[in-house]
Amino acid sequence: MAQAKSNRVAGNIFKGSVGNLIEWYDWYVYSAFAVYFSAEFFPKGDPTSQLLNTAAIFAVGFLMRPIGSLLMGRYADRHGRRAALTLSITVMAGGSLIIACTPSYESIGIMAPIILVLARLLQGLSLGGEYGTSATYLSEMASSGRRGFYSSFQYVTLVAGQMVALGVQIVLQQLLSEPDMKAWGWRIPFIIGAMGAVAVLWLRRTMDESEQFANIKSQKRESAGTIRALMKHPKAVLTVVGLTLGGTVAFYTYTTYLQKFMVNTVGLPKEVVSWINFVALLIFVVLQPIAGLLSDKIGRRPLLMAFGILGTLLTAPIFFFMEKTTEPIVAFLLMMVGLIIVTGYTSINAIVKAELFPTEIRALGVGLPYALTVAIFGGTAEFIALWLKSIGMESLFYFYVAGCIAISFITYWRMDESSKTSQIEAELGGGDNLVNNKSS
């Protein structure tokens, strides 16, 4: 009986996670292939300027994430985590197909970047809803005492989505010449992402719903998923903001911007940088469940404190050393130091946020303040870095990242140990964590 329940939990975690992988693959393909398609959507000119325009549109996608988290979070808290996750993957697939099919600037002029913006708005809407709902679902479905471990798979699949994007990039780099990549090869990964969503739609329709949501649905609470209900938890909302600020800036700096930094500032070949990123992210993925399991043993707060202290002290030195190196192995090792530090945040941030809120507003509570913070700070990190580089002050960005982490450290220092005050455990009272809710 216990084994059957464990298998059921693992199956639902897998179904929720693999959809998360496709969502983030579609999101990251844009960044991974920006160095190839940036010239397709903007007038010919300086490569840094084209990348700056592409990064600005990347940031625009982040601006839709709070709206997505508001709409999808409310939907998930009222109609179920499964229904919201199914809807989010459908919207993401649509955005990817639009990008894949959009003609170049030379063909349709200003309409090319306009359509690109619209597609990124759709993807931002989707991802905004995906994060909070996915974090909530994985946290609720996990077994008591293993929630840190199971919820860490949100970032396992999040980063795995980026790895798949990089893997596709590496394969295409081997098969196609650079002119072909810039002309049409960059469209292939967007088509792959849209096709992968079809399988995910089927998987997500067969997921079980959590017991927590089933209880809320049976009680028909009108306050479920409302801003009014969320505002009754101001401390939890502010904790999510403080928890996220430094973590999201550090995460996007090391996993998204660093690829461009190695090419444009360090001067390493694109193909070498792709391999460095792929191997580093593979190790990063393995670290997530290890750190998540550790948090089940020693608590969430020690990992966050380690990230806050080390991130504040070592971020600037890592970048100063990297910009002076010419050796790929040194660049790889420096990237790994950064990713190991960031693991203190990424591995457990989903469960920490989920443990702060009651079921009736958990998806909205996890998603909305997170999405607002990411839109303001995470989504603009790459743009700020490229802008500072364009005016010859790139090193200021290193201290900006360190400063953001320092602000979050104050939150980690002042917050309670969430595993000991978990709303999830308090509501469950030792009950099962899933129900077969396929008829709903």
What do the predicted segments below correspond to?
Residues 31, 234-283, 377-382:
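Extracytoplasmic gate region of multi-pass secondary transporters
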Residues 34-65:
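Extracellular/periplasmic helix-loop-helix junction of adjacent transmembrane segments
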Residues 55-74, 93-95, 278-291:
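Central cavity-lining transmembrane alpha-helices of secondary-active solute carriers
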Residues 78-90, 297-308:
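Cytoplasmic membrane-interface "Motif A"-like loop-to-helix N-cap segments
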Residues 90-109, 309-325:
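C-terminal ends and interior cores of transmembrane alpha-helices
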Residues 149-173, 369-381:
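Glycine-rich segments within core transmembrane alpha-helices of 12-TM secondary carriers
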Residues 200-207, 352, 402-429:
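Multi-pass alpha-helical transporter architecture, strongest
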Residues 302-348:
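C-terminal transmembrane helical hairpin of 12-TM major facilitator-type secondary transporters
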